[in-house]
């Protein structure tokens, strides 16, 4: 699991933000096709720009 995390984190570029479903979940986020609900904030996207990763 740690090796998987290292591979995904190195490939995704955490300094550039979350850009896919896997890194969204690793960062304790969830994907939604609308604005982030309630007090949640957008931390990236999930494959398509219109699908937001919220945390």
Swiss-Prot record:
UniProt entry tagged with the keyword NAD: no
UniProt keyword list: Antibiotic, Antimicrobial, Defensin, Disulfide bond, Pyrrolidone carboxylic acid, Secreted, Signal
Listed Pfam families: Defensin_beta
Family annotation (InterPro entries): Beta/alpha-defensin_C, Defensin_beta-like
Organism, scientific name: Bos taurus
Protein name: Beta-defensin 9
Family, per entry: Belongs to the beta-defensin family.
One CC-aspect GO term: extracellular space
Function: Has bactericidal activity. Active against E.coli ML35 and S.aureus 502A.
Subcellular location per the Swiss-Prot or TrEMBL entry: Secreted
Taxon lineage: Eukaryota, Metazoa, Chordata, Craniata, Vertebrata
GO biological process: cell chemotaxis; defense response to bacterium
Chain positions with Pyrrolidone carboxylic acid modification: 16
Annotated S-S bridges: 24-53, 31-46, 36-54
Tissue: Neutrophilic granules.
GO molecular function, one term: chemoattractant activity
